[in-house]
């Protein structure tokens, strides 16, 4: 497996990003070593909050949430998925599979040894993060699900996702910062959009971002359907808190909160919310997200 690594200087002087990088090496099934980046802020004895980003962002998406969690006494951990941020990037699009993403982040989770964690997941952060919850339920104390899902090939794609799938596979240059701006209600600054572009010096670094939309198991023929069905079985017995926090302006995941509220025992009686924002709700409602997580932790500890 050929692996690219974004030069460190691409991440120097980013707006609102004072956090020191931390790294874990994981081994792929083919023997390739991959370096995964994460941010780890706050007291070691604070409640660990795992903040998982999705397509095509990186941990920078949580820059306005991390300090709020730390100020509340919690520990904030935000990894970059393989192919994104400061994590290593396989150069061949075919090297990115749903199963591999789950395996890579499973190895990372075991290496950092999170226990009693509270997961906040959005977009592919949910498709991967919820699989981690299903595989390691003993490591998690609660979950907040936002603008994501755990698809099993049934139902129709939203028009928003169809358009995104078509665009992502055909556009000559994938405009990462532009996409983050378009998926947020507020207008991102030029510096913020540049920070989202930073992990990708050129198109060769974007194979993971190109591949993610095609990996979503929207049909029964997609890889990952059986594994997601098995994960749902675990979630259908999950009695720890699960809160939905979808946004009011995301055409891609509209209505996605319903199965979580209906099928997960731990979702009953929880203070589910609809947040103001687009697909990247972390950009639009960071204070509300941090407050929601703080409340969840204080209720359940």
Swiss-Prot record:
Record keywords: Hydrolase included?
yes
**Which keywords describe this protein according to UniProt?**
Hydrolase
Query: What is one Pfam family matched by this protein?
Result: Abhydrolase_1
In the record, what terms sit under GO molecular function? Answer: haloalkane dehalogenase activity
Q: Which residues form the active site?
A: 123, 250, 279
UniProt-listed Enzyme Commission number(s): 3.8.1.5
Q: Which InterPro entries match?
A: AB_hydrolase_1, AB_hydrolase_fold, Epox_hydrolase-like, Haloalkane_dehalogenase_1
Enzyme kind, highest EC tier: hydrolase
Catalytic function, reaction form: 1-haloalkane + H2O = a halide anion + a primary alcohol + H(+)
In terms of Gene3D superfamilies, this protein maps to:
alpha/beta hydrolase
Disulfide partners? none
Specify the superkingdom. Bacteria
Q: What does this protein do?
A: Catalyzes hydrolytic cleavage of carbon-halogen bonds in halogenated aliphatic compounds, leading to the formation of the corresponding primary alcohols, halide ions and protons.
Q: How does it assemble?
A: Monomer.
Assigned protein family:
Belongs to the haloalkane dehalogenase family. Type 1 subfamily.
Q: What is this protein called?
A: Haloalkane dehalogenase
Organism whose genome encodes this protein = Phenylobacterium zucineum (strain HLK1)
Gene (UniProt): dhmA
